[in-house]
Amino acid sequence: NNNFRTALWTGNNLQVTLMSIGVGDDIGLEVHTSGDQFIRIEEGDALVKMGDSQDNLDFQRRVSDGYAIMIPAGKWHDIVNLGNKPLKLYVIYAPPQHPQGTVHNTKKDAEAAEFNRIY
């Protein structure tokens, strides 16, 4: 997957998305209030940041190939690509977070879609 985000599979209670994060870029600081998230790093080096508020990301850990990150509902989080190639990961959302068939070619596309969904 070379898109920022591709919703690979969406069920009633679960969704799997593939992501490719550019060099020096990040997922974007966010919080999901209604569901948990599982992230697995398939390829690359990253920094995971998590906390109870966007101003208090008191958990930070370097991760790489094979690492899994569990993010409980209500935790602010971001993942920053620290490597010199795109960061490849997959995300499991429970419940689904994005419309079935979602494809965001770039982070900018994803941010615009999120803005339009909220407002």
Indicate where each model-derived feature is located:
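A short glycine-rich, His/Asp/Glu-containing loop-to-beta-strand
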Residues: 1-29, 35
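Short hydrophobic/aromatic-rich beta-strand segments that constitute the beta-sheet cores
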Residues: 18, 48-50, 89
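Short beta-strand His + acidic residue motifs that chelate non-heme Fe in jelly-roll/DSBH
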Residues: 29, 48-49, 71, 77-84
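Short acidic-glycine-tyrosine-enriched beta hairpin
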Residues: 53-72
